[in-house]
A protein has these predicted regions:
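Membrane-interfacial loop-to-helix junctions in multi-pass transporters
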Residues: 208-209, 225, 265-271, 395
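Alpha-helical transmembrane segments of multi-pass integral membrane proteins
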Residues: 345-448
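Alpha-helix C-terminal capping segments
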Residues: 75-78, 198-205, 259-262, 347-355, ...
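Membrane-interface helix/helix-cap signal primarily in integral membrane proteins
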Residues: 61-239
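Membrane-embedded alpha-helical segments of integral membrane proteins
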Residues: 1-43, 425-429, 433-471
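Hydrophobic alpha-helical transmembrane segments in multi-pass membrane proteins
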Residues: 3, 7, 36, 41-57, ...
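Hydrophobic alpha-helical transmembrane segments
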Residues: 2-8, 183-191, 211-222, 283-288, ...
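Divalent metal-coordination and catalytic microenvironments
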Residues: 86, 141, 216, 244, ...
Length: 497
């Protein structure tokens, strides 16, 4: 059952990509590739060709998304000054130190007409002394569709992957006092309250430790110097400065230990769901956090229904929900890294757990497994990452539980534990020292210019197939050479595409 669901969602993904790239290759080429897939399924892999219906559904869903963005790109107010009103969902700082806000616009007033339901990325030339997250604002600016830059990076697709329709620059932002009852107001009032509590907590931490805590626990790098971030990138440990499924796993582990200790069972799972919802807000709706929360929710549902929880099925459903919500998110680096890491855990970790040095190999598996992706996406591969991740992740596995626990204590009681604060500072400083010592090895990072993603896709496909139970049942046990030919043809098709 789990293999069928995962394969159905894989075909849905193929449909999304076929439709997106049909813009460049043409509809005829897309239909040819679809026909090739049908033939391979039928003649070589003995797979029900009804799975190709999921490919067609994926094509239709991506087409709807493409037409929606095309409509947004041709709205009458594009590249013209308009009055915009909406709520700020997240905030950050660009490389020039200017505040950047993502705003959910519910009113765009242009030529006496009102348009709504768009998401805008705003760069403000006016610096604020306080957070605007959760505030209803008004600004006057030109809403532009992002163009592809000269360096070849498709920033328009990048913003679409984040669910952002337009980018804009404004000189002044006015805060509005929203009156009346609206669901959107209630939602952003909650977001504002959580964000205010987060900022109050950060103000209690010592300045030297504040940047690390904000980066490691909340995924915000604004308080960390660019030199320090570059050091973590050079050692291949920059992932600790971004929130991930590790954080959600730790919250789940702490909660389950407490419920087991006090014999509460599953009766208080709503508290866990509330904590996870709060953390999604704290992490600025990070894709990796949303993915991990979806998996935990599926685990809770499985326990309630007394069903066996399967990690691959949960990943597949979480992936499908992400793609249905925004088909363009397939091009988001955060989503790609998040689900690729999850697949490595599903397919590779069971083999590692049979070895003697399982804990060490599990830490090393992810930086090695993500090597091909890092080469294609970032043009580098860190040799030091294999060594540096072991002590750094060990320290982070201590730091994150202390940090999350101290924050939630403060959230419910406004009590800041000086003991936990001291541990946060000490472990954070030790983590930096250890990472800095590895960064001294300047030759630990290889610069590799290779941007053809087809080879990386083929490599990961081969690794996951060989490490799967399907490989042993179909190919090894039954010596089915026809299946091997089918997989070779799929590889050739990927290269042709």
């Amino acid at each position: 059952m789990r293999r069928k669901l995962a394969f159905a969602i894989l075909n849905f993904l193929i449909g999304l990509l076929l439709m997106y790239f049909s813009i460049d290759y043409g509809v005829v080429s897309t239909l040819v590739y679809l026909g090739i897939i049908v033939l391979i399924y039928k003649l070589f892999l003995d797979i029900d060709i009804r799975y190709c219906l999921f490919v067609i559904v994926g094509c239709i869903w991506m087409l709807i998304s493409i037409l929606g963005h095309y409509n947004a790109e041709n709205m009458p107010f594009v590249s013209k000054e308009a009055i915009c009103r909406g709520y700020v969902s997240t905030e950050s700082v660009d490389k020039f130190g200017l505040p950047v806000y993502v705003c959910e616009i519910d009113e765009i007033i242009f030529n006496g007409m009102t348009y709504n339901n768009y998401k805008v990325r705003i760069t403000s030339k006016e610096k604020q002394n306080f957070s605007l997250v959760g505030e209803r604002i008004e600004f006057r600016a030109k809403l532009d569709v992002q163009e592809v830059r000269d360096d070849g990076i498709d920033y328009r697709r990048y913003l679409y992957g984040k669910g952002i329709d337009y980018s804009s620059t404004c000189r002044r932002i006015k805060i509005l006092r929203d009156r009346g009852f609206k669901l959107s107001k209630v939602r952003f009032d909650i977001i504002k309250a959580i964000n205010t509590k987060k900022n109050l907590f950060l103000s209690r931490i010592s300045p030297s430790a504040r940047g690390y805590f904000s980066g490691i626990i909340f995924g915000e790098k604004n308080l960390i110097s660019s030199d320090v971030i570059e050091e973590f990138q050079d050692t291949g440990t920059a992932h600790i400065l971004a929130v991930s499924g590790l954080h959600i796993g730790i919250i789940y582990m702490i909660f389950k230990k407490l419920t087991t200790r006090f014999n509460l069972g599953n009766r208080v799972d709503f508290v866990l769901i509330l904590m996870l919802g709060i953390y999604i807000v704290l992490a600025s709706f990070s894709i990796s956090i949303v993915r991990a929360v979806l998996i935990i929710l599926l685990k809770i549902i499985a326990d309630k229904l007394m069903m066996r929880f399967d990690f691959l099925t949960a990943i597949s459903i979480a992936f499908l929900i992400s793609l249905i919500n925004n088909p363009y998110s397939i091009f988001d680096v955060g989503l790609q890294l998040s689900f690729l890491s999850a697949l490595i855990i599903v397919f590779i970790f069971p083999h590692i757990r049979r070895t003697r040095h399982r804990k060490l190999l599990e830490i090393m598996a992810l930086p090695i497994g993500l090597g091909a992706y890092n080469i294609v996406s970032f043009g580098q591969f860190s040799l030091i990452a294999v060594l540096a991740n072991t002590p750094v992740i060990l320290l982070i596995s201590i730091y994150v539980p202390i940090g999350i626990t101290s924050f939630f204590i403060y959230l419910v009681s406004s009590h800041y534990s000086s003991i936990l604060g001291y541990l946060i500072s000490a472990i954070g400083e030790l983590t930096y020292t250890v990472n800095h010592s590895f960064s001294l090895f300047q030759k630990g990072t290889l610069e590799i210019e290779y941007s053809d993603s087809r080879l990386a896709i083929l490599l990961y496909t081969f690794i996951f197939i060989v490490s799967s139970e399907y490989f042993y049942v179909k190919l090894v046990s039954r010596h089915d050479l026809k299946q091997c030919v089918g997989f070779i043809l799929i590889g050739i098709t990927i290269f042709m595409f």
